[in-house]
């Protein structure tokens, strides 16, 4: 069964998945607030961040959300974590949620500490959980656009919703694995960005592969510990939504979070690094939320804490590294 899909958010990530869904035979209407971007996509049939990609005819665009929703059998969101609440609030004013809503963004809301799925439930109400889905995993947008093999996970509370979303996204090269632990899937995608910043700092100081692999492994331990205390399944974080996504984000040359960390090591301030990258670096905001939650629940997360202190307490990076290296080495999995 082919879907009519409203895709909310036409940044590089949103465009890559909208393009994938259209190439999979679905009718897709992409929405963005920016009329100039919509005009360029509609007239030139090229995305400014990926001008080499031809846009299929069954992918159209609008800056009017009600037009995107017309006849939609599925809604997919691909906006930043900061944009999630205003976009879903606008969506709520236009429709009651009676079709699957697939969240593909990764992050934790500032101030509230809510996962993006929890924002959706707060806005639409608990009964909307039956329509909610979450897609996450190692998926660099530029590689998805090129049709490179990719494996992700999809989670949903309702088995029928899970099947519908799974069918819509699955292609010969975009492998979609079901996972019933929606909160674990969401947390893995959010927290890995903080560890990736630490890996970028390691790259900037040229500490080498041994140090980076240590950060990834110990970082995964922090993520798994955090998620388990939050009620998630530990094995979820050992899979694509945790380890897989963490590896891709930490080692990819296309990772904003890793590049951000590298720029910090080269002497740029956080604001200067964000300006140079020119796009949202989700790990900056997740570091604050994760630190606040970890402090409240007394979860020991030394790498996350160090990144937070560098970003928000002006901790000298060299001092932060020294503090990590001077920690006691206790039993590995404690």
Curated annotation (Swiss-Prot):
Gene Ontology CC entries for this record: cytosol
Subcellular location: Cytoplasm
InterPro entries tied to this protein: 6-PGluconate_DH-like_C_sf (IPR008927), 6PGD_dom2 (IPR013328), G3P_DH_NAD-dep (IPR006168), G3P_DH_NAD-dep_C (IPR006109), G3P_DH_NAD-dep_N (IPR011128), NAD(P)-bd_dom_sf (IPR036291)
Pathways involved: Membrane lipid metabolism; glycerophospholipid metabolism
Binding site for sn-glycerol 3-phosphate: 106, 137, 139, 192, 245, 255-257
Record: active site: 192
Predominant location category: cytoplasm
GO terms for biological process, alphabetical: carbohydrate metabolic process; glycerol-3-phosphate biosynthetic process; glycerol-3-phosphate catabolic process; glycerol-3-phosphate metabolic process; glycerophospholipid metabolic process; phospholipid biosynthetic process
Enzyme class per UniProt: oxidoreductase
Keyword Acyltransferase attached: no
Keyword Cytoplasm: yes
Keywords, comma-separated and alphabetical: Cytoplasm, Lipid biosynthesis, Lipid metabolism, NAD, NADP, Nucleotide-binding, Oxidoreductase, Phospholipid biosynthesis, Phospholipid metabolism
Transmembrane segments: none
Entry EC number(s): 1.1.1.94
Catalysed reaction, written as an equation: sn-glycerol 3-phosphate + NAD(+) = dihydroxyacetone phosphate + NADH + H(+); sn-glycerol 3-phosphate + NADP(+) = dihydroxyacetone phosphate + NADPH + H(+)
Alphabetized Pfam families for the sequence: NAD_Gly3P_dh_C, NAD_Gly3P_dh_N
Binding site residues for NADPH: 13, 33, 106, 141, 256, 280, 282
GO molecular function: glycerol-3-phosphate dehydrogenase [NAD(P)+] activity; NAD binding
Similarity-based family: Belongs to the NAD-dependent glycerol-3-phosphate dehydrogenase family.
HAMAP family: NAD_Glyc3P_dehydrog (MF_00394)
Described purpose of this protein according to its UniProt entry: Catalyzes the reduction of the glycolytic intermediate dihydroxyacetone phosphate (DHAP) to sn-glycerol 3-phosphate (G3P), the key precursor for phospholipid synthesis.
Protein name (record): Glycerol-3-phosphate dehydrogenase [NAD(P)+]
Gene that this sequence comes from: gpsA
């Amino acid at each position: 069964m082919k879907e009519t899909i409203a895709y909310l958010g036409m940044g590089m990530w949103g465009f890559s998945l909208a393009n994938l869904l259209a190439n999979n035979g679905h009718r897709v209407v992409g929405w963005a607030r920016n009329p100039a971007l919509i005009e360029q996509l509609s007239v030139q049939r090229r995305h400014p961040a990926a001008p080499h990609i031809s846009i299929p005819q069954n992918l159209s665009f609008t800056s009017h959300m009600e037009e995107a929703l017309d006849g939609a059998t599925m809604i997919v969101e691909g906006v930043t974590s900061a944009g999630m609440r205003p976009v879903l609030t606008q969506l709520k004013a236009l429709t009651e949620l009676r079709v699957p809503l697939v969240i593909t963004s990764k992050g934790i809301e500032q101030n509230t500490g809510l996962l993006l799925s929890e924002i959706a439930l707060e806005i639409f109400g608990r009964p909307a959980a039956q329509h909610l889905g979450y897609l996450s995993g190692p998926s660099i947008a530029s590689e998805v656009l090129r049709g490179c093999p990719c494996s992700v996970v999809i989670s949903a509370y309702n088995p029928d919703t899970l099947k519908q979303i799974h069918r819509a996204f699955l292609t010969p090269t975009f492998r979609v694995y079901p996972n019933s632990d929606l909160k674990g899937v969401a947390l893995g995608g959010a927290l890995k960005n903080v560890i990736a910043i630490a890996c970028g700092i390691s790259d900037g100081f040229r500490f080498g592969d041994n140090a980076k692999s240590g950060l990834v492994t110990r970082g995964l331990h922090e993520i798994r510990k955090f998620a388990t205390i939050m009620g998630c399944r530990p094995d979820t974080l050992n899979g694509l939504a945790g380890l897989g996504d963490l590896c891709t984000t930490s080692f990819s040359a296309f990772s904003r979070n890793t590049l951000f960390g590298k720029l910090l090591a080269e002497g740029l301030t956080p604001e200067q690094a964000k300006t140079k990258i020119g796009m949202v670096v989700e790990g900056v905001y997740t570091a604050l939320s994760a630190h606040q939650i970890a402090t409240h629940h007394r979860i020991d997360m030394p790498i996350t804490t160090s990144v937070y202190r560098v970003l928000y307490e002006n901790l000298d990076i060299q001092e932060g590294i020294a503090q990590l290296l001077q920690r006691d080495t206790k039993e590995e999995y404690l």
